[in-house]
Amino acid sequence: MIIDAHIHCSGNEKSDDVLRALDEAGVDKAVLLAPFLNGNYSMHDRDSLRSANRYLSRLIAGREDRLMGFAVINPALDEASADLRVACELGLRGLKMVPAGWYPYEECALRIYETASDLRLPILFHSGIFIDGKSGRYCRPVFFEIIRDYPNLRVTLAHLGWPWCDEANAVGLIDLINGVAPDNSQFRFDISFGAPPVYRLEVLRKAIAVLTPGLLQFGSDVFLPCSGELIKSRMDDVAALLDELDIDEPTRQRIMGGTAAAWLGLGVD
């Protein structure tokens, strides 16, 4: 099973087109994030985020066998925990959080972790710098260690925390050092690369060596609407790196689907 665990919605896509793109790319299932990065939606407005989450619920309706919707929540806004519960009632199965103006260990974020833990929802965090020039100071991997205070949470740090990839490896390694099996680990890391191409091979080499493939998962980080060709090109980029690292087929399958399946509570075909 191939799972694309990091796809952005824009608010302009149609479910049939999304499924067609996945089919063209050879992707079985995908995590879709509620829109929050275009002019029609804002991360800093509660009504906007509620509208985005409702939109995503409608988009995936009847397609939940392949499309898993993740709500977008800003913990700094009033009633964020209540909005997360509403999103769950709408059929969304996880949440995306972007530390921007708040640190992952702040009280407002802890309330969301409590709610997500209660609802058993996985969390995808942005980690590392932002490509638009906003400060990434809130998104260093070490700041997410607070997650360990919520043992039922299962989270993924996107982009391997670039440029703090060694720090991300250190955070993820703790469970492995203590004998926790990858499928039961609290932390996973997506390889939707923030690293420029010149760094990517070494970043992935270290991550595989330190974290094992059991904690690494594929995400294209594309923005919908898009072609299957674009998604496939991101898959091909990863495949080329794995070729250079002489990675075997079972390991590739783990990175391209198995790790995300465990994170999402899915069976692996």
Q: What is each model feature region?
A:
Residues 94, 106-217:
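Catalytic pocket-lining loop regions of alpha/beta-barrel enzymes
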Residues 3-5, 10, 18-42, 66-72, ...:
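Divalent metal-dependent hydrolysis catalytic cores, especially in the metallo-beta-lactamase
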